[in-house]
Amino acid sequence: MLIGTADVEAYVEPLEVVSGAVETAIDITLSKPVYLAGETIIGQATLTPTMDLPDGDLAVSWQRERESHPLTRAPGPGGQLDGRIVPLGKRIPLRAGVPVVLPFEIPLPADAPPTAAAVHSSINWFVQARLFYAGFNAHQLERVRRSIVVVNAP
C-alpha cells in the first residue's frame, strides 16, 4: 500500500519523556513533521540543564514502534526497532540554564514502512534523543522522543 504526503494529516505532537529525571530538558525540533522513506530527517536537539551537571554525551536516532491491538484476543508484545545511533557530542558541558543547540541529520531507510493505524496493529515512527552523564553518579540517563509521520510515496 502506498501512502503519500497528501494522504496524511500531520501536526507536531508534544515531546514524550521516556526516561530520566529531566535534570536536563531536551527538546527536539524538526524541519517538518512528515518524511518520505529514504529521506533525511533534519533537526536540532536543544539541551537546557536545570542545574550544573556532569558533562554529557548526546546521540539521536529514528525509532519504529509496532503496537498490537487486536479486537478479539489479548494484544501481542509489539516491538521497537532503533535506527543507527548518530552521536551529536561527547563531554558536552552542562551548566545551569545555559542552552546547548546541536543540529542533526538522520537518514531514514529507503524501505521504511509508512506510519499506519489499522484494526489490529499500528506502526509509529519517532526521533529519539538520549543523554548520558559522565562518571559514576546518581544522574539517570535522559531519553525523549518526538513522533514523526513516515510515508512511502510523494
Regions found by a protein language model. Give the residues of each.
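C-terminal beta-sandwich interaction modules and adjacent acidic
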Residues: 1-154
